[in-house]
Curated annotation (Swiss-Prot):
Molecular-function GO terms, alphabetical: carbohydrate derivative transmembrane transporter activity
Protein source organism: Proteus mirabilis (strain HI4320)
GO annotation (BP), single: lipid A biosynthetic process
Recorded name of the encoding gene: arnF
Function in brief: Translocates 4-amino-4-deoxy-L-arabinose-phosphoundecaprenol (alpha-L-Ara4N-phosphoundecaprenol) from the cytoplasmic to the periplasmic side of the inner membrane.
Pathway(s) the chain acts in: Bacterial outer membrane biogenesis; lipopolysaccharide biosynthesis
Name of the protein this chain belongs to: Probable 4-amino-4-deoxy-L-arabinose-phosphoundecaprenol flippase subunit ArnF
Entries under InterPro entries matching the protein: EamA_dom, Flippase_ArnF, Small_drug/metabolite_transptr
Boundaries of every EamA domain copy: 51-125
Keyword field: Cell inner membrane, Cell membrane, Lipid A biosynthesis, Lipid biosynthesis, Lipid metabolism, Lipopolysaccharide biosynthesis, Membrane, Transmembrane, Transmembrane helix, Transport
Length: 133
């Protein structure tokens, strides 16, 4: 397997972790009134854990972007880009399996995930080179 494919999978996994952390962090924060609370040190300190979780999620996005840039150095875009959609698969599975999210398994979502995986597989297949006469 090319190194670029490993970077693409790492990017999708990091996006997955980032999404899950953002969901956890934002779910724990009280409703935001941005004009007041971001400058209130008491509010910030009282919510330091969920804010930290959100911040780590944002770092996950940055690391994912680094992996993605490394992917683009070695893989054609039409092969690399579909691999990003694997994050949909990972997020769905983890949101159903991990108890913090309490997402429900459904047939329609599962079939959609199967189609995504099938599409990624089809696009990643080598294409035959045809010559024109």
């Amino acid at each position: 397997m090319k190194t670029g494919y490993l970077w693409a999978i790492a990017s999708a996994l990091l996006v997955t972790v980032a999404q899950l952390l953002l969901k956890i962090g934002m779910s724990e924060l009280p409703d935001l009134q941005l004009e007041k609370q971001w400058f209130d040190l008491h509010w910030l300190w009282a919510n330091i854990i969920p804010i930290s979780v959100v911040f780590v999620g944002l770092i996950g996005y940055v690391l994912s972007m680094v992996c993605w840039l490394l992917t683009l150095r070695t893989i054609p875009l039409n092969k690399a880009y579909p691999l990003i959609s694997l994050s949909y698969v990972f997020v769905y599975i983890l949101a159903v399996v991990l108890p913090w999210f309490q997402e429900t398994l459904s047939w329609s979502k599962t079939i959609g995930i199967i189609f995504i995986m099938l599409g990624v597989w089809l696009i990643s297949q080598k294409t035959e080179q045809t010559t024109s006469h």
